[in-house]
């Protein structure tokens, strides 16, 4: 039997910390720091000029002058000005903030209705959507229940659309986690093909009670196989948000999933910034 739960109270999210990498990206936003070839962002160092193309080079003059001075030798006639050569040229190494693609993969199975887990999970998703709006992220929304996952929203900048899908999302049926992960990975791969500068974040909200899988496979091994494929790809930062209530009997399946994804695993309450509440006016402005 399906049931539509209300959305729980939203809250301010703690910053999501991503591992730094050396990939140079373009884009705008307010979440993740990334290396960039654009002449924007803060200077964090310098590099020797690659090739001999000076026309569009973002020259770091201070580092260039230091390199020329270190190479310079005082002649017999005394001090002379250093001569800058091509080998002295240094370019700026810059970092800037960009938005991310945040893929929400939400467990909407019947077990999420127990202890009003779905109400709390919806509140967490709304909080994360509000944070995504402020950070200028794109979002995608997948729900898994019954026998398979359903893509409720392809990547978009419209948080309002995601909110509507969240509000209407029913709960019921089995937990096809493997299907949810496979659809998430498909969306991420497609977006990376369209825009290689995308930096994806996968947020899986589940109690981990997996009990449905493709024909011929056991549920948890199928889910772990899908999780390991995402981890092996290496381009996605994943979090498994455990909706099981701490202090109750726990099955620790979410922990097993997080290990397969090589993901962090916060409980919902651990996402909350201390002492920060969301007021109704802020919510109305966003939605």
What are these regions (language model features)?
Residues 38-53, 106-111, 147-150, 164-167:
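Short hinge/gating elements
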Residues 1-99:
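Acidic/polar low-complexity segments with low predicted structural confidence
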Residues 257-287:
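C-terminal helix of von Willebrand factor
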């Amino acid at each position: 039997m399906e049931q539509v739960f209300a959305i729980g109270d939203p809250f301010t999210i703690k910053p999501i910390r991503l591992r730094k990498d050396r990939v140079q990206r373009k884009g705008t936003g307010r979440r993740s720091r990334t290396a960039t070839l654009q002449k924007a962002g803060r200077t964090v160092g310098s590099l020797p000029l690659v090739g001999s193309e000076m026309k569009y080079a973002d020259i770091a003059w201070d580092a260039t002058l230091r390199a020329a001075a270190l190479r310079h030798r005082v002649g017999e006639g005394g001090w002379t000005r250093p001569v800058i050569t091509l080998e002295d040229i240094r370019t700026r190494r810059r970092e800037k903030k960009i938005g991310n693609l945040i893929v929400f993969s939400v467990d909407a199975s019947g077990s999420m209705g127990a202890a009003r887990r779905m109400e709390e999970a919806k509140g967490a998703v709304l909080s994360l959507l509000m944070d995504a709006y402020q950070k200028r992220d794109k979002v995608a929304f997948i729900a898994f229940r019954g026998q398979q996952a359903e893509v409720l929203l392809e990547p978009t900048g419209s948080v309002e659309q995601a909110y509507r899908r969240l509000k209407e999302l029913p709960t019921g049926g089995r937990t096809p986690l493997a299907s949810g992960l496979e659809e998430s990975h498909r969306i991420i791969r497609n977006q990376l093909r369209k825009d290689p500068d995308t930096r994806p974040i996968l947020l899986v909200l589940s109690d981990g009670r997996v009990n449905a899988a493709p024909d011929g496979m056991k549920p948890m091994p199928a889910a772990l196989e899908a999780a390991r494929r995402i981890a092996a790809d290496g381009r996605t930062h994943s979090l498994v948000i455990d909706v099981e209530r701490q202090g109750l009997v726990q099955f620790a399946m979410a922990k097993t999933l997080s290990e397969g994804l090589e993901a962090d695993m916060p409980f919902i309450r651990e996402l909350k910034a201390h002492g920060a509440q969301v007021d109704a006016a802020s919510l109305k402005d966003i939605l």
